[in-house]
Structures are given as structure tokens and as C-alpha cells.
Amino acid sequence: DVTCASLGYYDWYEYDDLDGNTAATTIVVDIASSLGVLCVNSAGNEGDDPWYYIIAPADADSVISVGAVNRDGTIANFSSRGPTYDGRIKPEVCALGVSTYCVRSNTEDIYRTASGTSFSAPLAAGAAAVIMSANPEWTNMQVREAIMMTASLSNIPDNIYGYGILNTWAAINYQFTTGLKNEEIIPNILKVFDAY
């Protein structure tokens, strides 16, 4: 299952509370993740405000927090930044969140554009659902890893874009590192002698 939330709180918190363990909403996200749910959350729209940083529950260590970029891939000024208080890179990834098309709330057939990480997070959640459908044997955390490790800046992540702009096709085809196989292990030939 994939959940997507565009909620965030900092009113009751200080920056040092964004450690992935303090905020109530962060704890709930971690519980849901431990039960196999892939949780996607907007990073927040505080990038050009005094707060600046991501907001809870985007600080959870099991969430995919999503920042916003414009159509040319440049970070939106409002997109909240990392790191978490304990130094983890945030957001995990970015998606289009500037001038995204959506249906007007009071009609069924009139579209408008809107901006915010509340519009980038659903795009990432939809991508995550596609990745899960293509790889039903993967766990929620494997899907999270695939999304992060195939994003545009996965080799040089930062606290503005995180691991970069997500790439659904690359994530679908991601190959996990499985480690050494038994036949590749070299036996230890060290001999131990008794001391004199």
C-alpha cells in the first residue's frame, strides 16, 4: 500500500524536534512503515520562510519526503530544505510542484494550475504505486530505496533536491546489491601457533 499526505507541522516544534523520533505525526508514519505501508509526504512550503526546513512528518526516517521543482528542474523557492536535526538528507526526492495542473475544487471539468509540495508529493506517490505494481515482491523500503537510488542526484545528494528528481522507469528496473555469494568467500588460511 502507498499513502500520500500533504500535511506538516512545525507550530508546536523547534528545529531540534525534527530528529525523526519526536513529532507525533512522524511516529505514526514510522509505525505505518513498519507495517509495510510506503508513506509519501510533502516536504513543506517553508523554503522561503524563516522556518526554512522540512516539517513533521517529513522528518521520519522511513518516509519519502518530496520537494518541489519547476518545469526546468530548478528547485522551487518555497520547497522546504533539509537536513533533519540529526543530519539526514531531506527531502528524499523532488517532483514537479510549480504550476501543476489540477481540477478546480468547485467543478468537475475546469482545470487550473497550482504550486506547492502538496502537488509534488502525489506525483511521487503515483510513481511509487507504479513501481510497486511492476515489482510486487518488493517491500515498501525496497521501493523507497529504488526511488532514491535512481533519482537524478543519487550520487551527490544534497539538502535542497535530496537524491534528485525521481525517475520512475529507472526505479522500476533498479537492481539491488545483494552482497557476496557463498562461493565468492575466500577461506581464511591464517594459522595460529601456540605461544612459547
What would you call each of these model-derived segments?
Residues I172-A195:
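Residue-level detector of functionally pivotal "anchor" positions at catalytic/ligand-binding pockets or at interdomain
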Residues D1-S6, D30-S33, L38-S42, I64-G67, ...:
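Structural recognition of the beta-strand scaffold that forms the well-ordered cores
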Residues G8, D30-S34, G44, A68-R71, ...:
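Sec-exported extracytoplasmic/periplasmic mature domains
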Residues D11-G20, N41-V63, G67-K90, C102-T117, ...:
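Active-site-adjacent substrate-recognition loops and nearby beta-strands
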Residues A5, T22, V28, A32, ...:
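Hydrophobic, small-residue-rich alpha-helical packing segments that form membrane-like cores
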Residues T26-D30, I54, V63, I75, ...:
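Extracytoplasmic/secreted envelope proteins and their assembly/folding machinery
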Residues D1-T3, G97-Y161:
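Hydrolase catalytic cores
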